Amino acid sequence: MSRIGKQYISIPDKVNIRLEGQKVFVDGPKGKLTRILPSFICCTIDEPEKKVFLEKAEENKLSQALYGLSRTLLSNMVTGVSSGWHKKLTIAGVGYRAQLDGKDLILNMGYSHPVKMVTPPALSVSVESPTSITVSGLEKEAVGEFAAKIRSVRPPEPYKGKGIAYEGEVIRRKAGKTGKK
């Protein structure tokens, strides 16, 4: 039995959830999200208590695996439309910087050319300083995926720590060569 799947999802005041078959619609102050649940996952909404419960219709490995996943994805949708998701990245290194050109993100990361990244339409990117980037949006997966794409342009290296890292990420440092003396 999934410990995560058994838990209910509490619905905030300004968020509405409705079902049409296996399709779940979540509306909130930040926007709207839709997801199709697997056919063997049953969703029930308790309106007076403002809670959502998920149940398995079958007992097999696939339904067991997708039971907790479906609950977490639904919970992430509720959080996304109520408060949104954001991920911060920091840039370390001499001459490394970021800037916005319209909705496009331009990264100068020590290559012979600036790296231009087109922001997906569902996300917003802000550059607070040339060394700080924030990716925000409604869907947690989309925010994390685009932040990972930005980080992959120049991941932090272990010797000097130069590159793009998530805020709060711990970079394991290595000692350099000692050389002959």
Swiss-Prot record:
SUPFAM superfamilies: Ribosomal protein L6. Keywords: Chloroplast, Plastid, Ribonucleoprotein, Ribosomal protein, RNA-binding, rRNA-binding. Its main location: plastid. One of its GO terms (molecular function) is structural constituent of ribosome. It is found in: Plastid, Chloroplast. One of its GO terms (biological process) is cytoplasmic translation. One of its GO terms (cellular component) is cytosolic large ribosomal subunit. PANTHER family: 60S/50S RIBOSOMAL PROTEIN L6/L9 (PTHR11655), LARGE RIBOSOMAL SUBUNIT PROTEIN UL6M (PTHR11655:SF14). Binds 23S rRNA. Belongs to the universal ribosomal protein uL6 family. Part of the 50S ribosomal subunit. This is Large ribosomal subunit protein uL6c.
